[in-house]
Amino acid sequence: MSKIRAGPKSGRKQLREITRAGQKRVRYDDEATVADLTPDNESDSDNAEPSVAAEREDVEQHRGQAYNALLTLLKSEHPERKHKSNKKIKKDSQRAEEDSPENDGINSEDEQQNIENALDDVSGGVVDEEDMEDSLSDVDESEDESDPFESHFSKYSESRLYAFDKGFKDKTVKYKSSKTDVSEEESLIYSKPCLDDEEVLPVKGKQTLSSYFIKQKLKLANDFQNNGLPLTEIQKELVDPMFQYKDMLYEYDDYADEDQYRDLYSLHALNHVYKTRDRILKNNQKLQENNDEELLDQGFTRPKVLIVVPTRDAAHKIVRKIMEKSGLDQFDKKSKFEDQFFEDSLPPTSKPKSFQHIFQGNTNDFFVLGLKFTRKSLKIYSNFYQSDIIICSPLGIQLILENTDKKKRQDDFLSSIEVMIIDQLHSIEYQNAMHVTTIFQHINKIPEQQREADFSRIRMWYINEQAKFFRQTIVFTKYISPFANSILNGKCRNLAGRWKNHRKIKPEQSSIGQLGLKVRQIFQRFDLAGGTALDEPDYRFKFFTSVIVPSIVKSTGYEDGILLYIPDYTDFIRVRNYLKEKTTIIFGEINEYSNQKQLTSNRARFQHGKVKVLLYTERLHHFRRYEIKNVKSVIFYKPPGNPEFYSEVVRNIGKNVFLGNCDINISTVRCIYSKMDGLSLERVVGSKRAAVLAHGQNEVYEFK
């Protein structure tokens, strides 16, 4: 085997020669679903004729040589990165999986076995025998270079990609932005990575699907009119950046909006999958006519779309949406899917409406599901390596990517993802945000093992580990958070740029504007004194211990009934230890890791005045929405990420006032914040007020 020289353009000729020597092509068996992979279903390959088996063995050996050549190229060009280990984070992550409220009873052996079965290495490449047998009569492919499917993945030369790759590593790539005001309440921001002084214009606003090439099957299935499917106002805002393959971070206003944006991204995902498959099948025909033609149209593995959602209920809604829009009428294992993902149940009506929405239906958060499309049917529970779309929960895919048994770890099926969608990120953050970070650590990596792929047709930007420059990442959340921004700014390198919206909160839309309770609310700012974001927790803790704790000890208001609300669990541990070791304050605590006995006991002790202060975490409030009795004053260690939580917690005072247990003129609400709490603060007090609180001369502001 000749030595392969590393470099931005090297490897193509050698890989083509290695892979396609002899021009042998192998037909593969049908896909193996979770149910089909049981021991009772033995492969027919064991009974194959000796001559056929020998030919397959020769081809497999030949593929192994090709893959070794590929790895030689990749390792010389892209040394393996070493990730810093964080034992504390891993320990907390494991504890969160085992003990968090949303995970009760989900770690079943059956579900783990289903996932392991779906990872079994079975025959079948980017297209398999079933795809090859499909008729090409309805391949309506666009050759128009203005079609984003064409332009996005083919726009950049290898030398230009190499320059961007080097620029990102050297931190010489600069993002240039343009801002468009949609209304008084919302603006759109588009940023594009640049190597030079090119001008960045706003996203072209066509606001209609008719401007984009949609597969004929999807047009017929979705009753497209001459001007395209009628779009809602939200869909008009989203359609252009989405179908132009730009990264997106969208903060929606109402839970009813979810159905609208899912309509759009389901169509986008289907359109991408159908176009990808038909392009490959069409090129297969071209190669039969001219086998020397170079057609680069594939990745390492088949899956092209990854959808991450918090619960099975959300997954069920999305799969049903995909089925509805797919143009197919055959759905394999549909009844099994309904049994495992659908549940007709609602939370108690006494809980807030947002709680009822998030925790309706099947709230199990442990699953990974493969969807495979043929021209006639949708196969649910398909093997992951033969799937076109993978739908998962962060916890479910974490089991695969970071399995405690290193031999069972796999991430090759994520190597060729081109569209990644994270839905309901605000809910996912309360499960375990670290699992989302893990996905980004494993996506678009070079496969560790040989897979069924024709290396002569793999795009060079896959081989050069540059797929991250083309992957579209779409994030939907009810509330934009620093973590959401870190995904868009830190984990996404799409050369098409990134698009986000920003909602301006009017005073009457803010938490204090909708509170309906005339209680004294004091916002106290602490300065970082030149510190960075990494130093912020230390400055906050120092301010709390030096300013807030003395006010608790020498309170001029109520000496008991003080609810201390702490959003972050690590802050909670730090504060709890300080109060225990450094003060004489009698306090209780309830958090997401407390068992039911502790929750009941500590709430009762607080209610009856046996403890002066009760520590309460935001994650516990998200999952339980407790109405805590005997609350006379509230201290927010940090503004809540969800503005509804501010109102819900403060209203505990109002209920206590109604019962005659305290005087609203004596009760107080204190919230400590810094300039870095701008996103949360904006939703609590309103956009204009938040600007004053963050940058004003005063350090204390009061509302009533």
Curated annotation (Swiss-Prot):
Keywords: Nucleus, Ribonucleoprotein, Ribosome biogenesis, rRNA processing. GO terms for cellular component: nucleolus; small-subunit processome. Residues 81-90 have a biased composition (Basic residues). It is found in: Nucleus, Nucleolus. Residues 99-113, 127-148 have a biased composition (Acidic residues). Residues 1-152 are annotated as: Disordered. It comes from the Eukaryota. Gene3D superfamilies: P-loop containing nucleotide triphosphate hydrolases. GO terms for molecular function: rRNA binding; U3 snoRNA binding. GO terms for biological process: maturation of SSU-rRNA from tricistronic rRNA transcript (SSU-rRNA, 5.8S rRNA, LSU-rRNA). Residues 54-63 have a biased composition (Basic and acidic residues). Its main location: nucleus. Belongs to the UTP25 family. DEAD-box RNA helicase-like protein required for pre-18S rRNA processing, specifically at sites A0, A1, and A2. Component of the ribosomal small subunit (SSU) processome composed of at least 40 protein subunits and snoRNA U3. This is U3 small nucleolar RNA-associated protein 25. The gene is UTP25.
